[in-house]
Amino acid sequence: MDNGSSVRGGRPWLALLVISMFLQASCSSVSQTRDALRTAEVCCDDFAAMSFPAIHSVNPSDTPVVVELNDRSPVYSFSTGKSYFSAYALSHGQPGSDLLLMFAPGRFNALNSGTFCPIVTYLNSQHEPIASEDLVIRWVSADQSRSGYWTAAQTVPAAASYLIVHTSDEMLSRQLSIDAVTENQTIMVGYAVATIPVTRAAGYQCLPVGEVQVILLG
């Protein structure tokens, strides 16, 4: 007897139960990351009290600076909302250059996933925030699948002396969408389970934690 076909054909409720459990676990994970940020203590009262290690410029083929924000990262209450952050000092020649951020979906499980959605705050030499252009976010994928990453490009303001990578309340209220994603989907056909290719949009909830690669082009 084929035990696998017995499960697929005779117990459709089992597949539905597993799907329900995955969805509950993913929602719980999203909620837990946000609750941890909400209750975390801020590191300092102003920008001047932050630590600013130097950030090096790289060529496109070089290894980027990897920023990983999690519940062990410092926290600050920005004007855009409370966030984990990573701060850097700019050296001579870096203001006015191009900044490229690269980040990818981070799965909680196969059915639901999220991604860290970065923004950048620039400070002048007096640790005062200065205006900058909006980040332009694009999805990059060779085969129109979930195997890809986002890029966010920006020009570093000429007056900038420091940069801070973090997120915002506005970002955390959003989803980043990918159009025309093709993936296999499991459906119920009578009492049987079938897998079919489906092309649709995919949405990724913005999270306060995750990893982003920072490329400051020299």
Residue ranges and their predicted role:
Residues 69-93:
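Non-catalytic, beta-strand-enriched accessory regions in extracellular/secretory proteins
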Residues 3-14:
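Bacterial N-terminal signal peptides that target proteins for export
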Residues 27-43:
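Bacterial Sec signal peptide processing site at the extreme N-terminus
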Residues 15-24:
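Bacterial N-terminal signal peptides
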Residues 171-189, 197-216:
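Edge beta-strands of jelly-roll/beta-sandwich modules across compartments, strongly enriched
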Residues 111-118:
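Short coil-to-beta strand junction motifs in C2/discoidin
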